[in-house]
């Protein structure tokens, strides 16, 4: 409790353990309007289903996506989009948006080809 550990340094935030589950359950994720960084893997208006279940939170959970509970009006910003990656707590259900999965794989292939050109 209260300890922090250095990680990869990709996200400038601190994750910490909480006493209870936070943002638990099924959600729908959609891209926030201003997230041009993620448009190569995702298009706004085509949400992905996901779920969260964790005893951790972050000093900055990100703002690339808007997470919404399926029932009710509860929503929050989450996740980061950077260099073709989407990073955050939600676990994505790819079958809910096959185009998202397809674009993710396209991005992986493009990154591989980019690395091969350099070496």
Residue ranges and their predicted role:
Residues 84-119:
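Acyltransferase
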Residues 3, 48, 95, 99:
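Conserved active-site and cofactor/substrate-binding residues in soluble primary-metabolism enzymes
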Residues 34-82:
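Catalytic beta-strand/loop cores that center a nucleophilic Ser/Cys/Thr
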Residues 16-19, 43, 90, 94:
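Hydrophobic alpha-helical scaffolding
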Residues 19, 59-63, 96-98:
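Short active-site-adjacent structural elements
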Residues 6-9, 74-75, 102:
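Feature representing long, continuous alpha-helical segments
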């Amino acid at each position: 409790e209260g300890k922090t550990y250095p990680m990869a340094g990709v996200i400038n935030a601190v994750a910490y353990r909480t006493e209870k589950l936070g943002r638990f359950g099924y959600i729908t994720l959609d891209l926030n309007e201003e997230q041009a960084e993620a448009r190569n893997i995702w298009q706004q208006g085509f949400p992905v289903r996901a779920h969260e279940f964790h005893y951790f939170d972050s000093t900055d959970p990100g703002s690339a996506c808007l997470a919404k509970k399926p029932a009710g009006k509860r929503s929050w910003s989450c996740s980061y989009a950077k260099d073709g990656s989407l990073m955050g707590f939600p676990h994505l259900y790819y079958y809910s948006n096959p185009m998202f999965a397809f674009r993710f794989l396209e991005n992986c292939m493009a990154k591989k080809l980019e690395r091969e050109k350099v070496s």
